[in-house]
Amino acid sequence: MSVLLFGVSHRSAPVSVLEQLSIDESDHGKIVDRVLQSPLVTEAMVLSTCNRVEVYAVVDAFHGGLAVIGQVLSDHSGMSMSDLTKYAYVRYSEAAVEHLFAVASGLDSAVIGEQQVLGQVRRAYATAETNRTVGRVLHELAQRALSVGKRVHSETAIDAAGASVVSVALDMADRRLGGLAGKTAVLVGAGAMGALAAAHLSRAGIGQVHVLNRSLSRAQRLVRKIRETGVRADALPLEHLADALAGADVVVSCTGAVSPVVSLADVHHALAAAGRSAADETAHPLVICDLGMPRDVDPAVAGLPGVWVVDVDRVQHEPSAHAAAADVDAARTIVATEVAAYLAGQRMAEVTPTVTALRQRAADVVEAELLRLDNRLPGLDSAHREEVARTVRRVVDKLLHAPTVRIKQLASAPGGDSYAEALRELFELDQTAVDAVAAGELPVIATGFDAGAPQQPTE
């Protein structure tokens, strides 16, 4: 079984395609349940952000697993398989591991080095764990990816600028407006990205912030935090959006709604109410940062005179979205090292059931021979029998110790699975027994030699 990744991201598709594919966190379970209906898939996890939709799965067969995941995403998005595959990328086995480690490290983000994706990977894994759709393979992979992401951020300066999609978008707005100090902002959405935008606006010296959200109480909580920074702020119901836009200089929308929140009519109303003209497009435009996925702003708004829209596509082409080359290289070196170590550990873990089955086979042979000895020498006293048993077990343990340790070392290298196969052939180990150990149905044999002391005989 190997890890298969099927994904679409800002690097492979335009925002319009990501919009169709976007999966709300509450729907992760439905997508994964459909994927797991196939006997070819044993584990699955969905990572869906404003920049990517990725399904990680443990599959028994590459092509079969790929067809299953592709069909589920095709049905979900309404896209045909042929259209979907134009924008999709596939990673398998080692490449899938490397990709997730890079994603968690911020190396594949629209803003290189941003830290928000690490939290998104953590939430994706937590959701899958809650839904019990991850097993040993994805559990270990996700945990290691989170560890790698933390290491990259702590050991490199890839995030030294503290950049994120939100900060880059607002920096672009700042330049277009000649500064945000004293300006009026409208913040649509009071979630994590909304809070991040509020913090950035406060640091930029924004004069006033109107927060709109479907849940007014949540908007009010964010308003209280904004006021603590000394910025004037108020909470408004989403129905007041058109009026709020009329007095705005900059708008940040990041709600996660399934359809546009900022309509063409809303912006038309705002422009008319504010008396903006076409000349304002260059002099003092209404800057709208659309950071939602699917998009929060009707695409037609970008065509209005006097409006400048910043979306994820525009953000990723901004120079400040790219970290210094030296920091990126340092991060990639860490990722490569961690990938090699992880894969070596996985290969070693895969040979362990075979080694355990060999030890079990040896233990069975020893017990059978001791029973034979009892039958041939029924008069052997208990003390002598125990000494013979300890001696035989020590001999077997010593004979097995060096080759089993060495086989684990050899198995950790690329192509190491051939050593486990050779071990099974040489000692005629039953594959069923090996599989039972791997599934936890048979105990791992602890030998006296490995424990550092002779094993006591069982009566």
Swiss-Prot record:
CDD domains, alphabetized: NAD_bind_Glutamyl_tRNA_reduct
Pathway: Porphyrin-containing compound metabolism; protoporphyrin-IX biosynthesis; 5-aminolevulinate from L-glutamyl-tRNA(Glu): step 1/2
Record-annotated active site: 50
Gene Ontology molecular function: glutamyl-tRNA reductase activity; NADP binding
Listed transmembrane segments: none
Keywords assigned: NADP, Oxidoreductase, Porphyrin biosynthesis
Binding site for substrate: 49-52, 109, 114-116, 120
Keyword DNA-binding on entry: no
Biological process per Gene Ontology, one example term: protoporphyrinogen IX biosynthetic process from glutamate
InterPro entries on file: 4pyrrol_synth_GluRdtase, 4pyrrol_synth_GluRdtase_dimer, 4pyrrol_synth_GluRdtase_N, GluRdtase_CS, GluRdtase_dimer_dom_sf, GluRdtase_N_sf, NAD(P)-bd_dom_sf, Shikm_DH/Glu-tRNA_Rdtase
Top-rank lineage group of the source organism: Bacteria
Catalytic reactions on record: (S)-4-amino-5-oxopentanoate + tRNA(Glu) + NADP(+) = L-glutamyl-tRNA(Glu) + NADPH + H(+)
Site residues by UniProt (Important for activity): 99
Positions bound to NADP(+): 189-194
Enzyme Commission code: 1.2.1.70
Family note: Belongs to the glutamyl-tRNA reductase family.
Binding partners and assembly: Homodimer.
Function according to Swiss-Prot or TrEMBL: Catalyzes the NADPH-dependent reduction of glutamyl-tRNA(Glu) to glutamate 1-semialdehyde (GSA).
Domain notes: Possesses an unusual extended V-shaped dimeric structure with each monomer consisting of three distinct domains arranged along a curved 'spinal' alpha-helix. The N-terminal catalytic domain specifically recognizes the glutamate moiety of the substrate. The second domain is the NADPH-binding domain, and the third C-terminal domain is responsible for dimerization.
UniProt cross-references to HAMAP family, sorted A to Z: Glu_tRNA_reductase
Note: During catalysis, the active site Cys acts as a nucleophile attacking the alpha-carbonyl group of tRNA-bound glutamate with the formation of a thioester intermediate between enzyme and glutamate, and the concomitant release of tRNA(Glu). The thioester intermediate is finally reduced by direct hydride transfer from NADPH, to form the product GSA.
Name by which UniProt lists this protein: Glutamyl-tRNA reductase
Source organism of this protein record: Mycolicibacterium paratuberculosis (strain ATCC BAA-968 / K-10)
